[in-house]
Amino acid sequence: MSKGILGKKVGMTQIFTENGELIPVTVIEATPNTVLQVKSVETDGYEATQVGFDTLREVLTNKPAKGHAAKANTTPKRFVREFKGLEGAEVGAEITVDTFAAGDVVDVTGTSKGKGFQGPIKRHGQSRGPMAHGSRYHRRPGSMGPVAANKVPKGKKLAGRMGNKRVTVQNLVIAQVLPEKNVILVKGNVPGAKKSLIVVKSAIKAK
């Protein structure tokens, strides 16, 4: 059965195993999520579980959102996402961090940090030219295609806005789960800035 939860990135720290090994981990705070709706093929055309996270102040919401949340006996949520494969979920039920356990393999999704307008070296990892004073080619994009075409081919890797994209890191391992603090510790780093929304779900390519 697939598992999933919404949370916020707190930052990074490190923990030590019993044999003294140091492990860098990302701290994800996931307060209890509320199941807002269970979608079915008969009524919605597909199966999914709609989950809400982070209570939204009443002044910032509207009547449709209030009515939708009231069906689950809860308050409107700041973040609403859908998961597929969450079997047995009922409207109004809560999903907590203890649905996961240490050693679980998960996929983590977030929005990467925006880097602004960047050149091809930083954005695509292109090699730079010689830096000697006789060279006129240092950090330019280089050839953009053949002469005869008289145009730049689609998909050419050039300078542009970098980051601020939805990124999923697959097959990360959960190091620890702290139910009393609503915290999940994931080995390694995950995309996104501090306080940004993080989606943790069972890995689809786990070995």
Curated annotation (Swiss-Prot):
Ribonucleoprotein as UniProt keyword: yes
Biological processes annotated in GO: translation
Gene Ontology CC annotations of this record: cytosolic large ribosomal subunit
Positions of disulphide bridges: none
Record Gene3D superfamilies: 3.30.160.810, Translation factors
Pfam families: Ribosomal_L3
UniProt-listed InterPro entries: Ribosomal_uL3, Ribosomal_uL3_bac/org-type, Ribosomal_uL3_CS, Transl_B-barrel_sf
Key word RNA-binding present: yes
Single GO MF descriptor: rRNA binding
Superkingdom of the source species: Bacteria
Region of interest (Disordered), residue spans: 113-148
Keywords from the UniProt entry: Ribonucleoprotein, Ribosomal protein, RNA-binding, rRNA-binding
Family classification: Belongs to the universal ribosomal protein uL3 family.
NCBIfam families given in the database record: L3_bact
Summary of subunit composition and partner proteins: Part of the 50S ribosomal subunit. Forms a cluster with proteins L14 and L19.
PANTHER family xref list: 50S RIBOSOMAL PROTEIN L3, LARGE RIBOSOMAL SUBUNIT PROTEIN UL3C
Function per UniProt: One of the primary rRNA binding proteins, it binds directly near the 3'-end of the 23S rRNA, where it nucleates assembly of the 50S subunit.
Name of the protein in question: Large ribosomal subunit protein uL3
Organism: Lactococcus lactis subsp. lactis (strain IL1403)
